Amino acid sequence: MKIGNYEIYSIKSGMFRLDGGAMFGIVPKVLWNKLNPSDELNRINLSTRSLLLISDKRKILVDTGLGNKFDEKFKSIYAVENISIEDALKQKGFVSDEITDVLITHLHFDHTGGSTKFENGQIVPTFRNAKYYIQKSHFDWALNPSDKDKASFIKDDFLPIKEFNQIEFTDGNFKLDNEIEIILSSGHTPSQQHLKITDGKNTIFYCGDLIPTSAHIPYPYVMSYDLYPLITIEEKKKILPQAFEENWILFFEHDPFTSSVTIAEGKKGFEIKEKDIIPD
């Protein structure tokens, strides 16, 4: 798919599992289990899916998945089945040294684990020629998180990037270029970054953990992981009507069944119109 100057690719690097109840908050299991059935430990399947944008001048990657620095205990807890983000890129014909920009939505381990890697006994940035765009306020939060979300941050995923002077700290909404805008949300975690690319005809919005899967399109379907769930709902009420009116493509990082959808108005709110506009 092409939007403006950019060719668009979905980069799927693997699968993992999280507790279904935590993923759907107050929504009863009898409802969410129909959408994403749980295993014997109440865990549901989730994907790690990045977005790659290619122009003549830039190769932009949005989020980097789980990476491969974890141990066997971590792998077992989260039922990780993945390849490195580097191998996932190779499957599409690209190599990590080509990446010029890495936009990190936020620093939870399932979004930025692939940002660093082991090399010769040292943890180094995976994309050595890239700038990593991270909101400064979110980086500061990740260094001193709350008791609720501290388990979501692994400092080896992001401190080495700072040590190698590859972070481009950002502050609020901004534009990467004339076609790419970065929009913040703060219900899930402070200063989460969402990429929006448009050429006036087609628009893609990278949902991150504001709307982690297509099953989370209904307003009340909000994760227990969210620090401020009422803010999440208000942010969804701002994004989804615009996505409907302008026929945006919503791109999902964690949906195990579909990478992207457009939405329509249904009897109970917004619902899926088209699926997999950007194939994995």
Predicted regions and their residues:
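Conserved beta-strand hairpin/beta-sheet module of binuclear metal-dependent hydrolase folds
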Residues: 2-7, 12-92, 194-209
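Short, P/G- and charge-enriched loop/turn segments at secondary-structure junctions
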Residues: 36-41, 120-122, 182-183
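Residue-level marker for buried hydrophobic side chains located in beta-strands
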Residues: 60-62, 103, 132, 204-206, ...
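Metallo-beta-lactamase
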Residues: 80-94, 98-110, 126-184, 234-247
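Active-site metal-binding loops of divalent metal-dependent hydrolases
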Residues: 13-14, 64-67, 107, 137-138, ...
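Cap/insert and terminal regions of metallo-dependent hydrolase folds
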Residues: 76-83, 87, 198-280
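Metal-dependent catalytic neighborhoods of phosphoester/phosphodiester hydrolases
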Residues: 75, 112-122, 262-263
